[in-house]
Amino acid sequence: MSSIVVVGTQWGDEGKGKITDFLAEQADVIARFSGGNNAGHTIKFGGETYKLHLVPSGIFYKEKLAVIGNGVVVDPVALLKELDALNERGISTDNLRISNRAQVILPYHIKQDEYEEERRGDNKIGTTKKGIGPAYVDKAQRIGIRVADLLDKETFEKLLKDNIEYKGAYFEGMFGKACPTFEEIFETYYAAGQRLAQFVTDTAKVLDDAFVADEKVLFEGAQGVMLDIDHGTYPFVTSSNPVAGNVTVGGGVGPTFVSKVIGVCKAYTSRVGDGPFPTELFDEDGHHIREVGREYGTTTGRPRRVGWFDSVVLRHSRRASGITDLSINSIDVLTGLKEVKICTAYELDGKEITEYPANLKDLQRCKPIFETLPGWTEDVTGCRSLEELPNNARRYLERISELCDVKISIFSVGPDRNQTNLLKSLW
């Protein structure tokens, strides 16, 4: 039995999809365990580029299972659009499995997300407005509708009517706006559920069977540790737990099944949306990173905020997710910069701190303490080992590893699969 969890160590968009796809070649099952279609990842497969939001990266390997676990919130209509788009491009989706215990995103969740952001005004969280947060709220309130409920017409009808009554009063009282009606939702979403029924099963049993058969299971994380609702920059976080430990809850497997945790990061830092970002850049170096790195959100298209690498963040992520190995992406983006910087600690009210503050006010007063290293101008996109990298680029990666106390097992020097380099076997 062997399993690997891939998690983002920053604020998402670290390149987890690419690393998952890379590791998926040797896996038997690839499973998602948290988030929803707010997560976007770009995959290059067979010379083509695909942008996925809900579908696991393993979908491209027809002999492997691609699992959407119970911890994922599923918009049935959005998922069908994604599946149809893949089918139109000749990709079979017969290997998809969807948990019957996953929560369903409905139109009132999306509207609630939109209205909540409007209500917050300048204090908005910066959500993708996909209904993720409200769906998780309903789950916690025990009024959520699960995939198993969606497939049963009588159950779905009753639960939906009850929720529409409740949401109608809530929308009117909180926003002064109407809730989507039963008639606008029922037939469309029931039909969507029927189309998805062929994929629905008890995915926890699927994963357990894989472990019993000594198969290799790859868990695909969404977002990043710094967006975790418990361990991230609260309240500027997602509504779920992207940390590796959530595999046990969102995947439905025991903690003893996890063998390794791969922490994925960029050679710099990026963030979409609002919230603290101590190493954020607003100068020419920031412009260089954004444009060369094509830093625009897969889901939203919004320009990402960019900054220098923050080892305080990565050390926090290492502890929160039990990271055993590091994958550093987008090293090529820094090529051409005269100097590169790594944040080693923060200064808070005249004192040096090396731990990430929980208090938002403290965090806003933190000033990054940088270590400056010489940059490089040599082309790194063809490098296949650490030894082939320019001396300054190699020293930069080694310094990150030293500061974060995690060994580098993968490094990437470009967007293509053959630009991802494995330094040791992870399976």
Swiss-Prot record:
For this protein, what is the EC number?
A: 6.3.4.4
A Pfam family this chain is assigned to: Adenylsucc_synt
Give binding positions for IMP.
D13, E14, G15, K16, N38, A39, G40, H41, T128, R142, Q223, T238, R302
**Top-level taxon in the UniProt lineage:** Bacteria
Active site per the UniProt annotation: D13, H41
Residues the entry annotates as binding substrate: T298, T299, T300, G301, R302, P303, R304
List GO molecular-function terms, semicolon-separated.
adenylosuccinate synthase activity; GTP binding; magnesium ion binding
Main localisation? cytoplasm
What note does UniProt attach to the cofactor annotation? Answer: Binds 1 Mg(2+) ion per subunit.
Tell me the InterPro entries matching this sequence. Adenylosuccin_syn_GTP-bd (IPR018220), Adenylosuccin_syn_Lys_AS (IPR033128), Adenylosuccinate_synth_dom1 (IPR042109), Adenylosuccinate_synth_dom2 (IPR042110), Adenylosuccinate_synth_dom3 (IPR042111), Adenylosuccinate_synthetase (IPR001114), P-loop_NTPase (IPR027417)
A Gene Ontology biological process term:
'de novo' AMP biosynthetic process
Which residues take part in binding GTP? 12-18, 40-42, 304, 330-332, 412-414
Q: Where in the cell is it found?
A: Cytoplasm
Q: Which cofactor does it need?
A: Mg(2+)
The pathway is: Purine metabolism; AMP biosynthesis via de novo pathway; AMP from IMP: step 1/2
What family is it from?
Belongs to the adenylosuccinate synthetase family.
Q: What does this protein do?
A: Plays an important role in the de novo pathway of purine nucleotide biosynthesis. Catalyzes the first committed step in the biosynthesis of AMP from IMP.
Q: How does it assemble?
A: Homodimer.
Q: What is this protein called?
A: Adenylosuccinate synthetase
The gene that this protein is the product of is: purA
